[in-house]
Regions:
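Disordered, low-complexity "stalk" and linker segments at domain junctions of extracellular
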Residues: 1-148
Length: 148
């Protein structure tokens, strides 16, 4: 009888996913969400089995709102889904959280911006990069974040 031992995934694998700066990219668009010069810090969390939510990532992605008028932010989440499943096949979604920053410190608790299912409805394949991408609209809404 041949015993199958699945590959062992070290916890550093999760860190490798988190430290890639291109996981989140940003675009400012006209809107009423954020004043020019505001710094918004984003973090991710993973959803396991559709129920359990991991702690927020240690790594964060900061974005400074540009322009002379108020702006909303489109955050593009770029993920190699295959790599996520190497970490854990139980990951079913990714959650994007945000907080405003002043002098390097979060001025509020992180708010849920959106939960994105790891399926064809949440992510689409970018043939140029080979990564799965999802675009998330952030207008700074608090206490009423959309999960759909």
């Amino acid at each position: 009888m041949v015993k199958f031992n699945p590959p062992v995934i070290e916890l550093e694998s999760i860190g490798e996913l988190q430290f890639q700066q291109e996981i989140l990219t940003f675009e400012d668009i006209s809107g009423s969400g954020f004043e020019p010069g505001k710094i918004i810090r984003y973090r991710l969390a993973f959803v396991y089995d559709g129920l359990c939510i991991s702690p927020l990532t240690d790594v964060s992605w900061d974005h400074t709102v540009t322009g002379s008028d108020t702006q909303n932010i489109i955050v593009t989440v770029n993920i190699n889904i295959t790599m996520l499943h190497l970490v854990s096949r139980r990951i079913t979604a990714v959650r994007l959280y945000a907080a405003e920053i002043l002098e390097g410190t979060e001025q509020e608790l992180f708010r849920l911006v959106k939960e994105i299912e790891l399926d064809i409805h949440g992510f689409s394949l970018d043939p140029n990069s080979g990564l799965y991408t999802a675009r998330v609209f952030d207008d700074g809404t608090r206490y009423a974040s959309s999960i759909s």
